[in-house]
Design a protein with these regions (language model features):
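A composition/biophysics-driven feature that prefers long, compositionally simple stretches
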Residues: 1-180, 238
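Short catalytic-site patches enriched in acidic/histidine residues
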Residues: 55-65, 152-157, 161, 192-245
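C-terminal helix-coil-helix/basic helical segment that borders enzyme active sites and/or dimer interfaces
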Residues: 185-192
Length: 245
């Protein structure tokens, strides 16, 4: 195998223009500034978010794990998502803030990206409820001398207080669910397989979502529909079992 020293390890992959986000710039600035307010009170130099929910909430980018790590670093004056090269420029387009990409040429390139974004930081907030023991050890090895403090609970309380924009989107989501429920009820009949009912419901919701937003990523919309014995658990998967009268 050849040497990888001359390969790109951390880079900017700013392909295209920023995409439409469901929340305004003012709303996203508010969220990031809430983090900075906590940093100031807690004497923290930078925050590294790693969970789906926090990265999505504070940047607008929802990652797909696919065996690679993702992050978002918030400092006093900047917010940057960290993504894998497999995603191309999409994370940049979906991030409120900057983005850097790491390649697969070295296994520790993700940590190189973190070091690049947290130079000089002595106290860094991480999500204790998301960073497992091996992950924590790798962070300590990558950032020697840095003290890690928990931002997980503080960020949870920040996300708990909903803004007017969030409440509006929640109401739209509830209405979409009502439309899916109506389509589900209409499709139910003896002899119809569960999956056909679920398809009718999910399709109705997807069309509603697609029609109500100027640009939207259509993902993770589905219907849990069960019949007969399958109704004994809330999260029992859809099957091809036919509905009995």
């Amino acid at each position: 195998m050849g040497h990888t020293d001359d390969m790109l390890h951390v880079m900017e992959w700013h392909n295209g223009d920023k995409s439409y986000l469901p929340f305004s710039e003012a709303e996203m600035d508010r969220r990031q500034n809430d983090v900075r307010g906590w940093m100031s009170k807690s004497d923290v130099d930078a925050v590294l978010f790693t969970s789906y929910h926090c990265i999505n909430y504070y940047s607008g980018f929802l990652y797909c794990y696919f065996g690679r790590k993702y992050g978002m670093v918030v400092t006093a004056d900047k917010a940057t998502t960290i993504s894998a090269g497999i995603d191309g420029g999409q994370p940049y387009r979906r991030s409120h803030g900057d983005n850097i990409t790491y390649s697969d040429w070295n296994r520790d390139n993700f940590y190189k990206a973190i070091r690049q974004l947290t130079k000089g930081a002595k106290r860094i907030g991480i999500e204790f409820d998301h960073v497992h023991l091996d992950y924590r050890k790798a962070l300590e090895e990558a950032l020697p001398g840095v003290e890690f403090v928990d931002v997980g609970q503080a960020s949870m309380w920040m996300r708990t207080i909903k803004s007017d924009e969030e409440i509006k989107l929640i109401k739209e989501g509830a209405n979409t669910c009502d439309i899916g429920g109506a389509a589900c009820a209409e499709a139910i009949a003896a002899g119809v397989p569960e999956h056909e009912v679920a398809i009718a419901s999910t399709s109705a919701m997807l069309r509603e979502i697609a029609g109500n937003h100027p640009y939207v990523e259509l993902m993770d919309t589905w219907t849990w529909f069960q019949s007969g014995i399958n109704t004994d658990g809330a999260h029992n998967p859809v099957t091809n079992k036919k509905i009995e009268s």
